[in-house]
Amino acid sequence: MTTFMTKDFLLKNDIARTLYHKYAAPMPIYDFHCHLSPQEIADDRRFDNLGQIWLEGDHYKWRALRSAGVDESLITGKETSDYEKYMAWANTVPKTLGNPLYHWTHLELRRPFGITDTLFGPDTAESIWTQCNEKLATPAFSARGIMQQMNVRMVGTTDDPIDSLAYHRQIAADDSFGIEVAPSWRPDKAFKIELDGFVDYLGKLEAAADVNITRFDDLRRALTRRLDHFAACGCRAADHGIETLRFAPVPDDAQLDAILGKRLAGETLSELEIAQFTTAVLVWLGRQYAARGWVMQLHIGAIRNNNTRMFRLLGPDTGFDSIGDNNISWALSRLLDSMDVTNELPKTILYCLNPRDNEVLATMTGNFQGPGIAGKVQFGSGWWFNDQKDGMLRQLEQLSQMGLLSQFVGMLTDSRSFLSYTRHEYFRRILCNLLGQWAQDGEIPDDEAMLSRMVQDICFNNAQHYFAIK
């Protein structure tokens, strides 16, 4: 019987163990997409206790707590203490066997806290609370300290075009901190014309860009000013959350002006008008990214805020989203081609939330590759509900079968937690075990030099090269 979570966790043969311990584990982390707070990094936040750093804002854990029947007051309630929430989590963790949360919880205790020989649960919670809180009181366990312990080289936060990026500039000016914290442009509110808050958002964009927006060209000018601001602050990537992937041929500016005017007047748009406007903004943005050398990321297929009652109570991003099942292949093909036809398709990473679409994305990438950029269009790592063992394996295997795994830019945390860097470790163990199994089975050569290069490239080198501004 194999012991739970030894140093060789998930590594089933000697080849895998060599690849992980000798080559993957020492590589730095290039976390090009996350939801960390730049303010917390700028302020070098110190966490009061384990409950605070572990559970605050973590909707993965919140969903598990709700599934275990825990009262909402012990999940998000302001009337309960961090310790009470922590104990609710301690009572829930033994019930998560088979869920990636069980693995992540124990990996997070191992690194950075050094707790390697204790299962987390109600019987051990008090001891672990004390041990971890003692460490959290030291400088090595501040927000920056944890990032340094985990060998992070770069993080890409997720930022709205109206953001001042003051905290990014503060971090960049601090020579004592060697980790790059780059903003990522997330313009969802500027192209989702169908959303209730669209008109209010345009008002905020007007103020940030000092442009009065009444026509489509005004919107372009406002976004251009903000793109320039982001570029000046070190941005090299854009991200887009696309629940429903729409496409329609882009009409002329007069028609786009009419669509925008209807929306500003409070009139209802047709589905065609929504698709025309959305496509026009996304295609124009893609061309701007290409001109700047940025990477365009498309996260496709979530259904968000499913629970109206809880959305009214807690707002978005609180654990009430799930996997959508819209067809995406035709619209995605046309969207990418609309940029590529003028040779203005930027480097692009495609993510799907529905694993049914894995092969759709894996094959779509091959349609739009380009000379001089290895893996110009990427099939991104298992996202959200898929960043677990089976989901990561599916993505790696399907990418290898339909593209070039060797050119993959690898893992990202996509997380709001400073403890989630162990997801890179989880991914690296799964990657090394997959390659080790293939080599042991004679499906690929057992060539340490060849395999080690591939591992190190996927863990760090490919992403570092891919996100560089050339």
Curated annotation (Swiss-Prot):
Pfam families: UxaC (PF02614)
Domain of life: Bacteria
SUPFAM superfamilies: Metallo-dependent hydrolases
GO terms of molecular function: glucuronate isomerase activity
Gene Ontology terms: biological process: D-galacturonate catabolic process; D-glucuronate catabolic process
InterPro entries for the chain: Metal_Hydrolase, Uronate_isomerase
Pathway the protein acts in: Carbohydrate metabolism; pentose and glucuronate interconversion
Catalytic activity: D-glucuronate = D-fructuronate; aldehydo-D-galacturonate = keto-D-tagaturonate
UniProt-listed Gene3D superfamilies: Metal-dependent hydrolases (3.20.20.140), uronate isomerase, domain 2, chain A (1.10.2020.10)
The family this protein is said to belong to: Belongs to the metallo-dependent hydrolases superfamily. Uronate isomerase family.
Alphabetical list of HAMAP family matching this protein: UxaC (MF_00675)
Protein name: Uronate isomerase
Protein's organism: Salmonella arizonae (strain ATCC BAA-731 / CDC346-86 / RSK2980)
Lineage: Bacteria, Pseudomonadati, Pseudomonadota, Gammaproteobacteria, Enterobacterales
Gene expressing this chain: uxaC
